[in-house]
Amino acid sequence: MVSTSSFKTTKSEEIFTAAQKLMPGGVSSPVRAFKSVGGQPIVFDHVEGAYIWDVDNNQYIDYVGTWGPAICGHAHPDVISALHKALDKGTSFGAPCMQENILAEMVIDAVPSIEMVRFVNSGTEACMSVLRLMRAYTNREKIIKFEGCYHGHADMFLVKAGSGVATLGLPDSPGVPKTTTSNTLTAPYNDLEAVKALFENNKDEIAGLILEPVVGNAGFIPPDAGFLEGLRELTKEYGALLVFDEVMTGFRIAYGGAQEKFGVTPDLTTLGKVIGGGLPVGAYGGRKEIMSLVAPSGPMYQAGTLSGNPLAMTAGIKTLELLQKPGTYDYLDRITKKLINGLLTLAKEAGHEVYGGSISGMFGLFFTGEAVHNYEDAKKSDTAKFGRFHRGMLERGIYLAPSQFEAGFTSLAHSDEDVEKTLQAAKEVFATL
């Protein structure tokens, strides 16, 4: 960890200044630019376990975990060893490989809704593909998504989206034709009556409904009791498909994802992050009768040059093997509760209004005194105060997501000592806000 007196980011500043002349905003993904929290973005050099080091050799305890995939900790030796062996055989084949079969079997065994799976290269690609599949299966065009839920940056999903769209305060995105989003209906998360009204007003037109079963891209927002069950009932009643976007929650909040955790089985599921072990990956899957429509078995076309590449498959296999060990999710649940409960207590003792919670290795903290059940509630947070909190923690060697509207993540590499150091830093920062 660093101290405020020794915290220097000279090299990060030099590299980021140069990057701004080479890439839009100096980054390859918007949230990395620290626009919503202010201050100098950090340029990383290397990672290991629960820690990251920047190019100025500052060390941080990391609660971003490359936005979720690093559930076993960064650069886990078993994953690295497996990748070295796979790398000796080549980086990509553009043809079937045995690793695809192994990872597919593991995913099918773990996720209740998945009987067949197709691998792609990102969560965005998975959600784009599953949307096409929903429409192909039902022969309907309209879909329902929820305000603040993020399903990647494809045109049809950039309507009241979360993640970077929420972070930057963008209403939607220029360049997206109205015709592209005219069939995208939105409802507030955790509002069953609003969903029912959409179904009633668009009878026999809605192909399906997609959501993050636990919102992570508008901050951490869990489903209210009965919400997921209610969506399952409504979709069945109106002949629509239910899709869980488990790119973030899959293998994160339970080995079988949110659908295992809450006991609600959707028709289709999208995955990413954890199943690639830190390498680019995505997947979508569901019932065989639906997945059989995907080419070459059926007429719905979808393809990818690097889909199912041996490196991503190898990293995913080894990561899931590590997660199968007894006690994995109990440990994540305990260490994360210790962290979030400590943060909430310290903030309130210092006189700050906060709200937050956790499920397994996923957590969130809002700077608001009101309960957060949806995106509108989340937007009431004091983002300026969060920005100051983020900077104070960064200067003390704690790396949090640089946005009030992103969930945080722990890993199996985080120790009680890491959490205690984090809480000590937070106590100091809360006293300065």
Curated annotation (Swiss-Prot):
InterPro entries: 4pyrrol_synth_GluAld_NH2Trfase, Aminotrans_3, Aminotrans_3_PPA_site, PyrdxlP-dep_Trfase, PyrdxlP-dep_Trfase_major, PyrdxlP-dep_Trfase_small. Pfam families: Aminotran_3 (PF00202). It comes from Gloeothece citriformis (strain PCC 7424). One of its GO terms (biological process) is chlorophyll biosynthetic process. GO terms for cellular component: cytoplasm. It catalyses: (S)-4-amino-5-oxopentanoate = 5-aminolevulinate. One of its GO terms (molecular function) is glutamate-1-semialdehyde 2,1-aminomutase activity. Homodimer. Its EC number is 5.4.3.8. Belongs to the class-III pyridoxal-phosphate-dependent aminotransferase family. HemL subfamily. Keywords: Chlorophyll biosynthesis, Cytoplasm, Isomerase, Porphyrin biosynthesis, Pyridoxal phosphate. This is Glutamate-1-semialdehyde 2,1-aminomutase. The modification N6-(pyridoxal phosphate)lysine is found at K273.
